[in-house]
């Protein structure tokens, strides 16, 4: 049996990053040949990767790279938080993110095809899978370009956000839009404005919301829970609130005030508030999924859109991306 020296094991570990016992086993199997040992470890990684192909790489970390007018978010996935917290795993994530940024990658396939240490990223991750015994893969890639960019990585590097914005020429715009990025991390909007919704999607979500509230009200009544009955909204998105709908609603409010005997001279003070309430009650889908329609996490007395306009009338979010693991 070939005697394996500590020096040979150390050299193989340095070249591959594999564990000491794995390196020793590989050298024994290859009769002490370094190239043969590396091939052994590579094949071992392929076998482990094949066995774990159907596993979910639902843990991991997110890295952000922002330079000039471009920003990139990339997440590297693994199976457990234990591996995700490993310094080598975090360093590899940051390395791949910077490579993807420099190579102007647009898709995960682009990233996997990049060359790293004499092999491709995809092959490197197969080798990493063999080393740690967990599926490892690039799970998300997003690129945002714009004149001004803000980024935010949430504690633990589980969530990353990029925001492209117009600053209104204010010096503290970076700080303000970092706050908007933090809001996006916490509140998970999927689109910027209600107009981005598909009409059919909005209709289905409206019907689902109405059914949900009706079911909750029926349960409340049946079980005598004593909770206040919820109003069932006619609509769910600002996209549905056409000028005709708003005009009809305003007229209905005035008729209601007239029936209540409220003097007409004070209607102008009451109608705007009631109309605003109607809009809030009938845009629940927007409040859940549209950034500009959500109540601002850093000041929930106003929407994100209102907070931005209060910061500066010409400031605006142009685009944003949010990625997360687990």
Curated annotation (Swiss-Prot):
Entry's localization field: Cytoplasm
Annotated stretches, region: Involved in Mg(2+) ion dislocation from EF-Tu: 80-83
One MF annotation (Gene Ontology) recorded for this entry: translation elongation factor activity
PROSITE patterns reported in the protein's UniProt record: EF_TS_1 (PS01126), EF_TS_2 (PS01127)
InterPro entries linked to this entry: EF-Ts_dimer_sf (IPR036402), Transl_elong_EFTs/EF1B (IPR001816), Transl_elong_EFTs/EF1B_dimer (IPR014039), Transl_elong_Ts_CS (IPR018101), UBA-like_sf (IPR009060)
GO biological process: translational elongation
Entry keyword set: Cytoplasm, Elongation factor, Protein biosynthesis
Its biological purpose: Associates with the EF-Tu.GDP complex and induces the exchange of GDP to GTP. It remains bound to the aminoacyl-tRNA.EF-Tu.GTP complex up to the GTP hydrolysis stage on the ribosome.
Protein name: Elongation factor Ts
Classification lineage: Bacteria, Pseudomonadati, Planctomycetota, Planctomycetia, Pirellulales
Gene (name only): tsf
């Amino acid at each position: 049996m070939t005697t394996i020296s500590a020096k040979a094991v150390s050299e193989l570990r340095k070249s591959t990053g594999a564990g000491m016992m794995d390196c020793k086993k590989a050298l024994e199997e290859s009769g002490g040949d370094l190239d043969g040992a590396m091939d052994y470890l590579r094949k071992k990684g392929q076998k482990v990767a094949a066995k774990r192909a159907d596993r979910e790489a639902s843990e991991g970390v997110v890295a952000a790279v922002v330079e000039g007018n471009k920003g990139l978010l990339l997440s590297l996935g693994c199976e457990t938080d234990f591996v995700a917290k490993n310094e080598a795993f975090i360093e590899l994530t940051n390395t791949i993110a910077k490579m993807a940024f420099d190579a102007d990658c647009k898709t995960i396939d682009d990233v996997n095809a990049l060359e790293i240490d004499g092999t491709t990223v995809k092959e490197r991750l197969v080798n990493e899978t063999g080393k740690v015994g967990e599926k490892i893969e690039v799970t998300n890639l997003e690129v945002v370009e714009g004149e001004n960019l803000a980024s935010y990585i949430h504690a633990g590097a589980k969530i990353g956000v990029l925001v492209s914005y117009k600053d209104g020429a204010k010096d503290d715009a970076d700080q303000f839009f970092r706050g908007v990025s933090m809001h996006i991390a916490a509140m998970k909007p999927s689109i910027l404005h209600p107009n981005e919704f598909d009409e059919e999607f909005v209709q289905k979500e409206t019907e689902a919301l109405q059914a949900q509230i009706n079911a909750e009200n029926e349960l409340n009544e049946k079980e005598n829970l004593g909770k206040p009955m919820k109003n069932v909204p006619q609509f769910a998105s600002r996209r549905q609130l056409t000028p005709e709908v708003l005009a009809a609603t305003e007229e209905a409010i005035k008729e209601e005030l007239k029936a209540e005997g409220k003097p007409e001279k004070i209607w102008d003070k009451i109608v705007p508030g009631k109309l605003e309430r109607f809009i809030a009650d009938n845009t629940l889908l927007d409040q859940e999924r549209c950034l500009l329609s959500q109540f601002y996490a850093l000041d929930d007395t106003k929407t994100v859109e209102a907070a931005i306009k209060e910061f500066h009338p010409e400031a605006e979010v142009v685009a944003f991306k949010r990625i997360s693991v687990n």
